[in-house]
Amino acid sequence: MDAQSSAKVNSRKRRKEASSPNGATEEDGIPSKVQHCSVGLRQPAPFSDEIEVDFSKPYVRVTMEEACRGTPCERPVRVYADGIFDLFHSGHARALMQAKNLFPNTYPIVGVCSDELTHNFKGFTVMNENERYDAVQHCRYVDEVVRNAPWTLTPEFLAEHRIDFVAHDDIPYSSAGSDDVYKHIKEAGMFAPTQRTEGISTSDIITRIVRDYDVYARRNLQRGYTAKELNVSFINEKKYHLQERVDKVKKKVKDVEEKSKEFVQKVEERSIDLIQTWEEKSREFIGSFLEMFGPEGALKHMLKEGKGRMLQAISPRQSPSSSPTHERSPSPSFRWPFSGKTSPSSSPASLSRHKAVTCDISEDEED
C-alpha cells in the first residue's frame, strides 16, 4: 500500500472515531445528538433506609483525581447533595443535574431536611417533609434519597453513607452558629462546587405570590375555595367579590369599545368605497351629459341639422340668375259674382289709393 492510500485510510479512521453515534462530527459543525436512555426513569429513587448495604466490605474514599479519571462501573463516585427543596423548581433540578455530571461515573445521594430542623434553623415551609421527599424522589438525576438529613454534616454521617464528595454552590452558607456549614468539608478536600441558577429560588416564588396576593386570593375564591380556607376576612371576601364584578363590567365595556371601533372602522371603509364609486359614476354621468348637451354635443348637431331642413322646406328654390325674368300681368279687378252691374265710378282719390294697393300686392308677389 502506497503512502497516499494509507493517508486516506487513516483520515477515514480519524473521521469515524470523531463521529458521534448518529454520524455527526465536530468538523461538520453539527452538534451530536444525545441518545435516548430510559434506564432508571421508570421508578422513583429509593430511600437510603430501604437499601441494604454490605458494611462488611471496607469502604475506601476515592480522590478527586481518581474520580475525574473515572472509576469502575461497580464502584461509582458517591456524591452527596442536601437541601430543603421546598416548592421544588428548576433551580433545584439544575443543581442536582450538576451533581450528577461532576464525574464520569456518579451516584448522587440527596439529603432532605425534616420539618423540625428546617423550622428551627431556616423558617416555615410551604410543603411538608413528605411532600418534599416525594418531589426529590421523582427527579431524574437522583439515585438515592436520605430522609431527615442532618443540618451539619458529621464524619459519622459521611462514613455511614460512604460519601466521597459533597456538592453545593460555593457561596458560604451561614447557619446554626457557623459562618459556613461546609467549611470543614472544604478543608477535608471533599467539596465539589456547583453553580446556582440565577433568577429562580423558593424565596422568589413566595415573593411573587405575596406580591400578587389579592389576585391569587380572588382566583381561588372563584375556583370554589372558601374564605376560611384562604384565611381571608369577611370584609376582604366581599371586597374581592366586588372587585371581580367591577372587573367583569370593565371587560364588557372594553369588549363593547373594541366592537364599536371595529364597526366604525368598517363603516369608514364602506364609506370610502361608496365615495369612490360615486366619484366614478359622477364622472361617467358628466361625460355622458357633455357628449349630449355640450358645445359640440350630439343635440346641437341634431338641432342644426333639423333647422337646416326646416329652412330648406319652407323657402322656395331660387331661379338661376341667367334665366330671363317674367313679368306678371296686372291682376284683374275683383268683382262680386252674379253682379251684372258695374260698380259706380270712383272718385279720383279712391282710384289713386286703389292703384297704390295694387302696386304693393304685385311687388309682394314678385318678391
UniProtKB/Swiss-Prot annotation:
It is a peripheral membrane protein. Residues 315-324 have a biased composition (Polar residues). One of its GO terms (biological process) is phosphatidylcholine biosynthetic process. The modification Phosphothreonine is found at residues 325, 342, 358. InterPro entries: CCT, Cyt_trans-like, Pcy1-like, Rossmann-like_a/b/a_fold. The keyword ATP-binding does not apply. It is found in: Cytoplasm, Cytosol; Membrane; Endoplasmic reticulum membrane; Nucleus. The gene is PCYT1A. This is Choline-phosphate cytidylyltransferase A. Sequence repeats lie at residues 319-324, 329-333, 343-348. CTP binds at residues 84-85, 92, 122, 168-169, 173, 195-197, 200. One of its GO terms (molecular function) is phosphatidylcholine binding. Pfam families: CTP_transf_like (PF01467). Residues 228-287, 298-315 are annotated as: Amphipathic. Keywords: Acetylation, Cytoplasm, Endoplasmic reticulum, Lipid biosynthesis, Lipid metabolism, Membrane, Nucleotidyltransferase, Nucleus, Phospholipid biosynthesis, Phospholipid metabolism, Phosphoprotein, Repeat, Transferase, Ubl conjugation.
